[in-house]
Amino acid sequence: MRIDMTGEPGDPRHPNEDYASAALPSSGEGGALVVLDGVTPPRDGTGCVHGVPWFTARLGGALLELATAQRDLTLGSCLSEAISRTAAAHCSTCDLSHSRTPQATVVAARWDEERVEHLVLSDSVLLLEHPDGPVTPVLDSRLGELPPHIRALRSRVRALPEGGAGRRAARAEYVRAVEALRNNPDGTGFYTAAADPAVARHAVTGTTPRSEVSALLALSDGASRWSEMFRLGDWAALLALVRKEGTGSLVARVREAERADPHGTAHPRGKAHDDASAVFAELGPQAPAGEASDG
């Protein structure tokens, strides 16, 4: 078993709004990992006195603890309970009904000698490496499947000069349109973990036999830029890079690509530099039936 993780803020002057962690129970039976990507708050506030880093630390910590200690619960149930616990921790001081109350994307995975469970909510990514080499991405694609009128707004933003008043106004209009799709109770749009535990039922979940998974890699979208935005390689190449050079090297290469295109001319994006987090778990050979893993 090998765990490697890196988390780095997009701007060193501001705290990282991601959360990344992993746990290996002392029993030696499997493990779990969690990566959250906190949604950057709007300038006009969120109704919360704590902030996004506090929220992701509370939610991520609760989810990891539940996934590790409550193995009888599904990951969806663990996420639902973690959201409830986090909401209870600040419902007396904050307006959790605010549309932009702190929220985050979620990746979680849990494994033992028999199976690997996964959960993905919104645009963070989980990669499953199989023993014979192929890599399967687990994606929640709903944020990328925007309606045509919103895609048109996005194209309009990208066509306007960087830094101009026209671009700022167009971007504000685009952001409002996207936000109107977030956590819609009617089942349309896309979902992030905020204060409503019911959102957990919208997560992409599944189970894979342990014998079919040799490694896992969880990525916030700041780290998955290497493949999704900068097109430096496919998912298999990304995981191979991490296996060979580590998660720190992946983030460093993303930073190089960001610096090479500081104004988003070649690769239009909302942030020149984004928080980037990655957790890699190399599971190692599966223990023979009837034998406990040594972790």
Question: Over which residues does each language-model region extend?
Answer:
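PP2C/PPM-type serine/threonine phosphatase catalytic domain
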Residues: M1-G295
